[in-house]
């Protein structure tokens, strides 16, 4: 038998001086397209070289965010749309209320119609929440504009414009030309003037226009009547017929003063002087002006003295009749009787104005 040691069967190889073999890396786990990669590896292609390029090609793109069903919003534009406030104009055309005595039932019908309108406009909200949202949106510009158009009976939505049947007709103003063909240059062609537009309105529109015109005339007449009444009242308060004018009052006061002071006028007869009065004046040694002498000039009034001041001066100059020691008799005693009127000697014409202080 042969010895295995002799044959060198158990000799270990010299790993210190040998180099490791280069083995290809392990393939990736099984995935779609792994067979192709296995074939590449079998064919000697290195998949690591194309790894970066494969990742760039297979990188997923960011998905675009698309809203498929946008949720409706209760804003001013939706409230002014065809299902919004304009729909309320014709909602109660077919509704019949029972009238007096059935107010509760009529109110239920009204609320039911309003709830139906709110649900059609925005089904997402309950009726109470819809009313709260509607109240907060009343100040928006779109809502205010829509309300003004409704009050003025103006067209709002597209159907309102279609209901107004407007027919525009153009008339043919062509001039009869001869049968021969004439060629005119382009410079001589003048554009035809604008043709008159004939508008045919419906009967309902004409009735509405007539009603608005009548209401405007009534308001104008009421306004003019109110202005006329106010002007008449102001004129009546300014010129009161019961008020006495100042010039009439001054004339009456002047006549009263003249009658009390005893100043005769040109139309009055000269006064009669009693003999007893002259004797009394001589007994008290009072100076009496001679008739034959010229009358003393009447003093001119200083400024525009009021009649009350002249009256007070006259009363202060005359002696009092209530005093028993006064030399002047009462006027009742000075007046002559009817029997003595014929025997009394008439006095000569007295001057127009005498000095009262010098006479007495």
Curated annotation (Swiss-Prot):
Residue spans of biased composition, Basic residues class: 62-71
| Subcellular location, principal | cytoplasm
Localisation? Cytoplasm; Nucleus
Q: What are the protein's UniProt keywords?
A: Cell cycle, Cell division, Cytoplasm, DNA damage, Mitosis, Nucleus
Q: Which domain of life is it from?
A: Eukaryota
Q: Does the keyword Coiled coil apply?
A: no
Keyword DNA damage, does the record have it? Answer: yes
GO CC terms? chromatin; cytoplasm; nucleus; replication fork protection complex
Q: Where is the composition biased (Low complexity)?
A: 225-239
**InterPro entries assigned:** Csm3, TIPIN/Csm3/Swi3
Q: What does the record list as GO biological process?
A: cell cycle phase transition; cell division; DNA replication checkpoint signaling; mitotic intra-S DNA damage checkpoint signaling; positive regulation of cell population proliferation; replication fork arrest; replication fork processing
Biased composition of type Acidic residues is found at 34-48
What role does it play? Plays an important role in the control of DNA replication and the maintenance of replication fork stability. Important for cell survival after DNA damage or replication stress. May be required for the replication checkpoint induced by hydroxyurea or ultraviolet light.
The entry sums up its family as follows: Belongs to the CSM3 family.
Query: Subunit arrangement?
Result: Interacts with timeless, which impairs timeless self-association.
Which PANTHER family is this protein grouped with? TIMELESS INTERACTING-RELATED, TIMELESS-INTERACTING PROTEIN
Q: What is this protein called?
A: TIMELESS-interacting protein
